[in-house]
């Protein structure tokens, strides 16, 4: 379906391009909505990331073939997502993030088809493989009726071409149908050179990703108009920005301001001194600096906690707002964690850490079913083949973790912005406190493994002697000892999450 049904056409885009030339490429000024208000709303959310083509089909099939190595469209759709919102909400998620929605190159390339949504051809058309404009609007409406939010993945760093960069037919792109809108062809060769990162091209000689000159006011002006209309037409609450570190930084701010909603930028870099400054240009950043130490600690029982505890502190001092970082342990670009370890206790600990740490938790579809695909394309499985089992041990764990996070936010308006502190640690466990006095959660994460056990005492909890606290995972209760300390036993390597009984009152958690 064309966006033209909403009053936004290729002709309008062409007019904008022509007008911007007439005014000497001066930036277009918009009546901006309140991005900060949107960002504040997102701090309290828990996001379920969906690869639209692989989550749920319109026909409801749980047997339809989807061979990931074929890299073909498998039939996932907006209607499929709508029909499975109970499944998502049953895990306590308050938002979803879906794949890019615009028209893709149609070719069967050396890397298959563009089922993932990152090979853009035309921003004036929707990708009809996922459904119609009305179905996308219905998805937003159904989410909002449940007080849930919609985040859509957006690409504005590049287009895509099936072939070498020297052979690109720019006239096939809409609306940027001339080479002058793009950087000259050169593949990125040095990721330590920011000019090379921003001005050269991602991709390779098989599938080229022509790099837009987003620093050009003509180009970013079109995207400002486009995203403003796009967000309003489809009632979108937030945007995930693909390849953000490859975009001119000033353009990131212009785009977010024009969108009027929270933007979560993909900055694929584990160094916080590189990643954190991107919050000067957009509100949110994917938390790769946290991803790597989390991955290393929870995937290896011989790893020690020092790197992870250090990174918690470093992010708090380096990033302007850790509550707006997007935390994850799996996504469409990374291997699934169960492909690295089959130890269920380690998998549960990393899930708990992601959901209960500083920032916005993002769980990748299929984590709740223990999907174990490795590198792309193996990590983009069809979820329907799992049967959407709500009795899965990971589905039940994620439900509990989201439930306690949502309850903590309900009881304590400062919970999301309260910075976690590591109150106790050793080589193989970390205990954190998050939340204001009388409402704080004490979470204990470990990498002992399913055969591991350890008796520990956690001090500096902020509890008072005699306070009753409950581990929401096991539902076992403990009385705080002298000075509020907790003496507990880690058994079977399981994480523990303690909350005061007063916080749980009326929640239904552990029958409270």
Swiss-Prot record:
Comment on bound cofactor: Binds 2 calcium ions per subunit. Calcium is inhibitory at high concentrations.
Residues forming coiled coils: none
Entry keyword annotation includes Secreted: yes
Active site, per annotation: 242, 266
Disulfide bond annotation, renumbered to this chain: 66-74, 186-200, 276-319, 475-510
GO molecular function annotation: alpha-amylase activity; calcium ion binding
Family: Belongs to the glycosyl hydrolase 13 family.
Name the record gives this protein: Alpha-amylase 1
Source organism per UniProt: Schwanniomyces occidentalis
């Amino acid at each position: 379906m064309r966006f033209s049904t909403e009053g936004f056409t290729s002709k309008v885009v062409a007019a904008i391009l022509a007008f911007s030339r007439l005014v000497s490429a001066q930036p277009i000024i918009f009546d901006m909505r309140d991005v900060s208000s949107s960002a504040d709303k997102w701090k309290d959310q828990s996001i379920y990331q969906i690869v639209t083509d692989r989550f749920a089909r319109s026909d409801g099939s749980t047997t339809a073939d989807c061979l990931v190595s074929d890299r073909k469209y498998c039939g996932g759709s907006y209607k499929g997502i709508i029909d499975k919102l109970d499944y998502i909400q049953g895990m306590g998620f308050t938002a979803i993030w879906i794949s890019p929605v615009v028209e893709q190159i149609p070719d069967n390339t050396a890397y298959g088809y563009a089922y993932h949504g990152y090979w853009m051809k035309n921003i004036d058309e929707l990708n009809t493989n996922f459904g119609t404009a009305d179905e996308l609007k219905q998805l937003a409406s159904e989410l909002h009726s449940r007080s849930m939010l919609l985040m859509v993945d957006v690409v504005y760093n590049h287009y895509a071409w099936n072939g070498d960069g020297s052979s690109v037919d720019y006239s096939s792109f809409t609306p940027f149908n001339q080479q002058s809108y793009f950087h000259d062809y050169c593949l990125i060769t040095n990721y330590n050179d920011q000019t090379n990162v921003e001005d050269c091209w991602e991709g390779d000689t098989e599938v080229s990703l022509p790099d837009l000159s987003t620093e050009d006011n003509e180009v970013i002006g079109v995207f400002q108009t486009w995203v403003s209309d796009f967000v309003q037409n489809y009632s979108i609450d937030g945007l995930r920005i693909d390849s953000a570190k490859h975009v001119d930084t000033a353009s990131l701010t212009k785009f977010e301001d024009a969108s009027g909603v929270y933007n979560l930028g993909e900055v694929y870099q584990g160094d916080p001194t590189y990643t954190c400054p991107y919050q000067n240009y957009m509100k949110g950043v994917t938390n790769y600096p946290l991803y790597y130490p989390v991955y290393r600690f929870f995937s290896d029982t011989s790893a020690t906690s020092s790197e992870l505890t250090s990174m918690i502190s470093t992010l708090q001092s380096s990033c302007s707002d850790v509550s707006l970082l997007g935390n994850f342990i799996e996504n469409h670009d990374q291997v699934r964690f169960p492909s690295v370890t089959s130890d269920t206790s380690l998998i549960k600990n990393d899930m708990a850490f992601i959901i209960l740490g500083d920032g916005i938790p993002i769980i990748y579809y299929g984590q709740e079913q223990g999907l174990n695909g490795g590198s792309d394309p193996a990590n983009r499985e069809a979820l329907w083949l799992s049967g959407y089992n709500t009795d899965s041990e990971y589905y039940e764990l994620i439900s509990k973790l989201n439930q306690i996070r949502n309850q903590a936010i309900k009881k304590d308006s400062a919970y999301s912005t309260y910075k976690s502190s590591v109150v106790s640690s050793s080589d193989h466990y970390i205990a954190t406190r998050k939340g204001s006095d009388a409402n704080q959660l004490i979470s204990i994460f470990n990498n002992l493994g399913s055969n591991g056990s350890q008796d520990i005492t956690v001090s500096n909890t902020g509890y008072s002697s005699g306070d009753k606290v409950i581990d929401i995972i096991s539902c076992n209760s403990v009385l705080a000892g002298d000075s509020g300390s907790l003496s507990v036993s880690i058994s079977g390597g399981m994480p523990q999450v303690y909350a005061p009984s007063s916080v749980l009152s009326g929640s239904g958690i552990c029958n409270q």
